[in-house]
Design a protein with these regions (language model features):
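Catalytic domains of carbohydrate-active enzymes, especially glycoside hydrolases
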Residues: 76-102, 207-210, 312
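The substrate-binding groove and active-site-proximal loops of carbohydrate-active enzymes
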Residues: 61-72, 112-128, 180-194, 239-250, ...
Length: 427
């Protein structure tokens, strides 16, 4: 995800941009930030809600712990992750199965991920079908499992020659562009978009996943120039400016996925996790009272349109800021997304920054290890919030601040997990 899915230097910089932080504003508090007091009924409703956790595989953030593990070691780590999800009273795991133009399962369209074996294109030990093992393990425990892909990212550095020969970027070099040190599939090329859609159809055809999911990487940023020729070829005749054309490319992709995956599996959940700010009020009349990086303008993702037109089943905005932050207030953004989802059938799950709880954080609000619990209280009193998804799985290991504080909250408010009659369980 733009703020957090990679902890590389470049993406940490993007975190700062996305949050819109400056040294002076990072701790700025909005004294007028609206607060809510949940009722007993609110807490009871929250106790039985959908709760998910992202399991990041890019750069081995969460799984596997390192490359080159044996099949038995991969299974043991998967079991530990799934057992922990049950313990935390989660109801779903979002497993990243395509971090970079690759796959955590045998695919006809993408090579095996190098984050498993150490070399892209090389199968895991004993040809273990990693996704299938996770699907079976999740369902055995009553957990939903959602297959999470990054649709367009090809590399985070390195050379194309280092990729497997059957990587789409190697097979179709005309489908890609390089921005900085990273390569991306070009969303403006219809065949490239179609290939990504086919990849998701392959997953729902071959695996009993409960959902398919993408995060917030669409176009890499606003000030790119690498697709000007693509615009001349595919967009200029119909669009007066490249910005609207880019948004249309992303809109088409989202609608195509919605149509094609539901042809195969009508009940599968198609979800998107965008950056937490759609647009600022100062830039768009329908935007939020914020001053941060905007997915509508910077990533060309018109998520509000997808919600209103119901071309997605669930939205999980990454509201990765604290309550009271002047430029991007958690409470203001939660209310904004609630209002957008009101009157639609789109589920609204809040993406919560569990990873930011840190007694040594440079931001005062996140040094207070109760910040996520305060956000949970606010969400309990927000009737249009349907649940949460937490980033990221490693933050719920033994001794981690998010684990300890959330277990306390879950116990206090009698959270129902997959073994306690939560309606989101697959049991």
């Amino acid at each position: 995800m733009t703020q957090t899915k990679l902890f590389s230097t470049g993406l940490l910089l993007l975190v700062a941009i996305l949050a819109g932080f400056t040294a002076s504003s990072a701790n700025a508090q909005d004294a007028s930030a609206p607060l809510k007091t949940p009722t007993a009924a609110d807490y009871e409703r929250q106790a039985a809600q959908f709760r998910g956790v992202w399991v990041s595989t890019v750069s081995n953030i969460d799984f596997p712990s390192k490359r080159g593990l044996t099949a038995d070691e991969l299974k043991a780590e998967a079991d530990a992750q799934l057992d922990r999800a049950v313990e935390m009273k989660f109801t779903a795991v979002f497993l990243q199965v395509r971090p970079m133009g690759d796959a955590f399962y045998p695919s006809k369209l993408y090579p095996w991920s190098g984050f498993i074996s150490g070399k892209q294109g090389q199968a895991p030990d004993q040809n273990l079908d990693v996704l299938q093992y996770w699907v079976e393990g999740a369902h055995k425990r009553g957990l939903q499992i959602h297959a999470w892909i990054n649709p367009y990212r090809v590399t985070i550095g390195g050379k194309l020659e280092d990729l497997a020969e059957n990587n789409p970027a190697r097979l179709h070099p005309d489908w890609i562009f390089k921005h900085g040190e990273r390569y991306f599939l070009n969303p403006g090329i219809p065949e490239a978009r179609e290939h990504v859609v086919k990849g998701l159809v392959e997953i729902v055809t071959n695996y009993d996943v409960d959902g398919v999911h993408i995060d917030d990487y669409f176009y890499p940023e606003r000030n790119i120039t690498e697709d000007l020729e693509t615009y001349e070829k595919y967009g200029k005749a119909d669009f007066d400016n490249i910005e609207d054309w880019r948004r249309d490319n992303v809109n088409k992709f989202v609608a195509d996925v919605n149509r094609e995956v539901h042809k195969v599996r009508p009940n599968v959940v198609w979800s998107v996790s965008p950056a937490g700010i759609w647009a600022n009020k100062g830039s768009h009349p329908d935007g939020s009272e914020t001053r941060g990086n905007q997915c509508y303008f910077n990533l060309y993702a018109d998520v509000r349109k997808w919600i209103k037109e119901e071309t997605i089943d669930a939205v999980i905005p990454q509201i990765y800021w604290h309550i009271g932050l002047e430029i991007a207030n958690f409470s203001i953004l939660t209310d904004w997304w609630s209002d957008v989802c009101e009157g639609t059938d789109v589920k609204f799950y809040v993406g919560v920054a569990a990873y930011r709880l840190d007694p040594n954080s440079k931001t005062e609000a996140w040094r207070d290890l109760q910040e996520v619990n305060r956000q949970l209280v606010y969400m309990a009193a927000s009737p249009r919030v349907d649940g949460q998804v937490f980033f990221t799985a490693k933050n719920f290991k033994e001794g981690q601040p998010a684990r300890n504080t959330m277990l306390e909250y879950a116990k206090e408010h009698n959270w129902k997990g997959v073994n306690d009659g939560n309606p989101n369980s697959v049991k």
